[in-house]
Amino acid sequence: MMIGKYYRNREERCISGGTGCGVVYLSGCDMHCAYCLVYEISQKGAGTPATPRQLADLLLSLQERGVSHISLANVEPSAGEVVEAITIARERGLALPLLNNFNGYAPAALTRRLLPYFQGYVMDFKYADAALGERLSAAPAYPARAVENLALLSSHYGPNRYAENGLLQSGVLLRHLILPGAWQNTEEALRLLAKHNPCGYPLSLLPDFVPEGNTAAVLSPPYTVPAGRLRQLQALAAELGISLL
């Protein structure tokens, strides 16, 4: 297992509060997004070797820094070691909610295995267009897998539960990166979510495209969705009954 980087960050308010969210990126990924924001970590394996006990130490140190939640990204390639680390950390006093920052693409059996160790998921819902998923992420089965995984999360967590201060106690947040020029993918992703989100999990629409991967293969240089287009997509989400963060 390799730890790519870790830090305190401002995420969605319900997982950051006033103290921030602890974010840990593990190295490796089961997708190959050409535009990945952490391309060196996810695709090239950059990072520092770590044992489960060392990852447990890191989780406890983030708790000591006062974060409200801890989000672990790229869990699936190191699933066994992550489970061991979480078990050690819980035995040593880790009390914070743990979130799996999840790309949505893992096989269902692996998702089932990991669910009991996390209080929630922050799940990407990247593609409704399977061909686009294949071209940009080498993930042609993405829409079907994402829908299957969302069903598993919905069954396991049920509707989101929040503390009195508005912080997420258990449940799921969804994210969708709006890819430049691929507006139809976003529109269809919203329609697909509307059909397969029985618990009404809220969605963050992400308008800032900042590729750091194989720039020859991505859709565009760094780009922010025009305000008018973003309003159209937000209006479609509202029309479909999707709650936006």
Where are these regions (language model features)?
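Conserved Radical SAM active-site core
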Residues: 2-116
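Hydrophobic faces of well-ordered beta-strands that scaffold small-molecule active sites
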Residues: 22, 70, 98-100, 121-123, ...
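Conserved non-cysteine loop/helix-boundary elements of the Radical SAM core domain that shape
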Residues: 41-54, 74-81, 132-156, 182-185, ...
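Active-site beta-loop-alpha junctions enriched in small/polar residues
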Residues: 75-77, 103-105, 126, 177-179, ...
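Alpha-helix-loop-beta-strand connector modules within alpha/beta enzyme cores
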Residues: 85-95, 148-153, 230-233
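Short amphipathic alpha-helices and their capping/turn segments at secondary-structure boundaries
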Residues: 106-117, 190-200
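Non-cysteine beta-strand/loop elements that form the S-adenosyl-L-methionine
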Residues: 115-130, 202-209
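Auxiliary Fe-S-binding modules of radical SAM enzymes
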Residues: 158-245
